[in-house]
Regions:
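C-terminal transmembrane helix and the adjacent membrane-cytosol boundary/short C-terminal tail
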Residues: 2-24
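Immediate post-signal peptide segment of exported/extracytoplasmic ligand-binding proteins
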Residues: 23-37, 155-165, 296-303
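Short, well-ordered beta-strand elements
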Residues: 30-44, 62-68, 162-168
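Short, polar/charged alpha-helical segment
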Residues: 43-63, 176, 180, 184
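A local structural motif
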Residues: 58-68, 162-165, 183-196
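Short helix-initiation/N-cap motifs at beta->coil->alpha
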Residues: 65-78, 170, 191-203
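Ligand-binding "clamshell"
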Residues: 99-128, 209, 221-235
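A conserved helix-loop-strand patch within extracytoplasmic ligand-binding domains
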Residues: 109-166, 248, 266-270
């Protein structure tokens, strides 16, 4: 498909075309009448992409075209730089390390500032304030594993790693700021390491095929399975605050749009994001329904 949204909600959510003055504004704005929202390919960013989509459609004269399911942050970044999309959501840590190739930093405010400045100066991209939550890595185990091995922190986990089996994303295995650094800097040596896709990690830990997983703070299944999150006492993991990256020219040309998007600043905490992820991944709601419900609850869209 062309990435446009389909489904029963799309008509109902769009602004009434008879809305006075709408057509004139669209013509005046020329090719800016459409905003293309991109996302990479997992539940959380799909929900956030739907939130941005409806927020824009409900409060402006733009139509939104969706290019969801791009394969990862780098592809979204390229698409934004090349004008294929106008905005996408990503995490400050990912932007710092993977997109901008900057050295590791675990100071959340400094990371945001560095990302903001480099994105604007070198790429013409505006970085929003954090949407609120920090979706960083959190090593997690079953409560009984935590008890058996006396695990409360990352330090404990490293010490006991030779007795434990890790199930983690391939990205966690490969990214130099993740497992390779845990091994080289702290001598971590898991008994076994399995590269597993997103939800398979949880199936594996549930079935005792692995002892430890690299969860994210907002994972739906983290709370559902009642896993114990180990404290990052080493400040090992960089901050991963969700932010919107938006074409800077678009925002400069339209302060009203900038104001509307800023309504998401600080609006979503870890618990809220985790609950929205669970509504999709566990309860089977669509990302679009969940986004709509969030916007209505926050007074950012009407029923």
């Amino acid at each position: 498909g062309d990435g446009r949204r389909h489904g029963p909600l799309s008509g109902r959510l769009r602004r009434d075309p008879s809305d006075a003055g709408g057509a004139g504004l669209k013509l005046a704005r020329g090719d800016q009448k459409t905003i293309v929202v991109g996302t990479s390919n997992f539940t959380e960013v799909n929900i956030l992409g739907e939130i941005s989509t409806e927020l824009i459609e409900a409060n402006t004269d733009y139509e939104v075209e969706q290019r969801f399911g791009l394969s990862g942050a780098a592809m979204c970044f390229d698409a934004l730089e090349q004008g294929g999309i106008d905005m996408f959501v990503e995490y400050t840590g990912t932007a710092l390390l993977n997109l901008l190739a900057q050295p590791m930093d675990t100071d959340k405010d400094r990371v945001w500032q560095t990302v903001h400045d480099l994105m604007l100066e070198e790429h013409g991209i505006q970085t929003s304030n954090p949407l609120g939550y920090n979706n960083t890595y959190v090593m997690s185990v079953k409560p009984e594993t935590a008890e058996k091995y006396g695990l409360t922190s990352l330090s404990d986990l490293i010490e006991k790693s030779p007795e434990l089996r890790l199930g983690c994303t391939v990205e966690f295995m490969d990214r130099e700021d993740c497992l390779p650094l845990l091994e080289s800097k702290y001598g971590t040596a898991f008994q076994d390491v399995k590269g597993l896709d997103a939800s398979l990690r949880y199936t594996a830990i549930e079935n005792d095929e692995v002892d430890v997983v690299d969860a994210f703070a907002t994972d739906a299944l983290l709370s559902k399975l009642g896993l114990t999150m180990l404290e990052d006492d080493l400040s090992f993991f960089p901050p991963y605050y969700a932010v919107n990256f938006v074409d800077a020219e678009l925002l400069e040309s339209d302060p009203e749009l900038a104001e509307i998007l800023s309504r998401l600043d600080g609006a979503i905490d870890e618990a809220t994001m985790g609950a929205m992820n669970a509504q999709v991944d566990v309860d089977g709601m669509s990302a679009q329904e969940v986004a709509h419900q969030f916007l209505v609850e926050h007074g950012l869209a009407t029923e």
